[in-house]
Structures are given as C-alpha cells and as structure tokens.
C-alpha cells in the first residue's frame, strides 16, 4: 500500500525558536525551510509514499515545497497543529477516500526513504499507529489506515497522548532517521551525525557545527 503524507509547517519566521542558542534570528527561517525541503524530498522518494501534502500558510515555504512536487494545503482552521492536520487529512481523503494517511514531522532532515518505507509498511498492520521521536517523548509519524480517522494529538508528551488514544506504538529498530526530529542544537548535531540532506547540510555549514553532512 502507498500512503499520502500530511506534513505540517508553521510560518518560517516563527519556526524553530528552540534553536536560538545555535542559530540566530536571521538563520532559523532558512534552516526550518531546509529541514522541510529535505524531509519532503526524501518522503517523495520513498516507495511507500504516493504523494505528500504540506500544510502551511507560509507563501515562501509553499512555493519551495510545491517545486519539489508536494501539494500545498492551506493551514486552516486557525485552531493549532492538530486541527490543521485533521483538516488536511480530510482534504486528502475527499479526493482519495480509500487512502491511508500519515502525518509526518517537517523537521526530519536526515530522513531516508527506505527507513520511512519500513515504518509505513509496519503501520499497515494497524488501524492507527505511531512512531515515537528519538527522545521517546514526542511523535514523528502518525498513520491511519484507509477508513480510519487520523485523530492527531501532537504537542507536549504526544507519545503518551497517541498511545492513550488507541494508536499502536511501532517498536521498530534501525529507523533512526525517521525518529530524529530537530528542535534543539543537540538534535541538530544528532541529525548531522546520521547524515542530512543537501539543503540542511548547506544551511548548517553556516552555523559552523562539526559533524558529517549530506551523506545519506
């Protein structure tokens, strides 16, 4: 089965504030865009992915990600991340009612297509399933099988919240690139150690952070 991914991205000017100790105000928007571009490019290259819908109200991000082949869905209603994801899932399903839908974080710059395919193939076995992040507190992917609502519960302690909602936690090994989201400088260094995509490698080079880059 191939999946449609829904990728949320907030306005670039407000993105990645927790990277303030690593990247200044003038660099963070470009870094957030680079993360999203590398995430979307890798997702579109995965054999398990049919297409990618990016949920954003940022015109620059929308233009750049559409150029990669993503569909852009307006960031609405104005009710936060989970409302936007639920809306986007409904938009996707309006045209493909039998599609499996998965929400994927936009800050996975080390994402590898084959590892994403493994996660999505495992998710096929369950009505709803999720993958915890590298910190084992949050969530990087939430999948809903055809005919099932996504019911996103992203935010603080989303791992516990998704588990409480009835979604099955995927305990896969060897999928570090799908779990390594980037919120802090330490996260970015961990992603660089895995090997990030070309756009993140170029943006991170301006930060003078040591570590392997662009090898994936």
Swiss-Prot record:
HAMAP family: CofC. The keyword Nucleotidyltransferase applies. Pfam families: NTP_transf_3 (PF12804). Gene3D superfamilies: Spore Coat Polysaccharide Biosynthesis Protein SpsA, Chain A (3.90.550.10). Belongs to the CofC family. It catalyses: phosphoenolpyruvate + GTP + H(+) = enolpyruvoyl-2-diphospho-5'-guanosine + diphosphate. Keywords: GTP-binding, Nucleotide-binding, Nucleotidyltransferase, Transferase. Guanylyltransferase that catalyzes the activation of phosphoenolpyruvate (PEP) as enolpyruvoyl-2-diphospho-5'-guanosine, via the condensation of PEP with GTP. It is involved in the biosynthesis of coenzyme F420, a hydride carrier cofactor. SUPFAM superfamilies: Nucleotide-diphospho-sugar transferases. Its EC number is 2.7.7.105. One of its GO terms (biological process) is F420-0 metabolic process. This is Phosphoenolpyruvate guanylyltransferase. Pathway: Cofactor biosynthesis; coenzyme F420 biosynthesis. It is an enzyme of class 2 (transferase). Phosphoenolpyruvate binds at residues 139, 155, 158.
């Amino acid at each position: 089965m191939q999946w449609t991914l829904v990728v949320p991205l907030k306005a670039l000017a407000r993105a990645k504030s927790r990277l303030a100790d690593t990247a200044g105000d003038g660099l963070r928007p470009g870094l957030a865009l680079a993360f999203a571009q590398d995430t979307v490019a890798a997702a579109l290259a995965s054999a398990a992915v049919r297409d990618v819908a990016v949920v954003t109200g940022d015109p620059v991000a929308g233009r750049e990600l559409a150029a990669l082949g993503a569909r852009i869905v307006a960031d609405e209603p104005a009710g936060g991340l989970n409302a936007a994801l639920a809306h986007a899932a409904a938009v996707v399903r309006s045209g493909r009612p039998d599609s499996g839908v998965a929400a994927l974080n936009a800050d996975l710059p080390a994402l590898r297509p084959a590892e994403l395919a493994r996660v999505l193939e495992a998710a096929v076995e369950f009505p709803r399933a999720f993958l915890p992040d590298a910190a084992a507190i949050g969530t990087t992917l939430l999948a809903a099988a055809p005919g099932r609502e996504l019911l996103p519960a992203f935010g603080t302690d989303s791992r516990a919240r998704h588990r409480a909602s009835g979604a099955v936690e995927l305990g896969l090994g060897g999928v570090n690139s799908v779990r390594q989201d980037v919120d802090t400088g330490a996260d970015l260094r961990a992603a660089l150690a895995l090997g990030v995509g070309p756009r993140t490698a170029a943006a991170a080079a301006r930060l003078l952070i040591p570590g392997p880059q662009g090898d994936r």
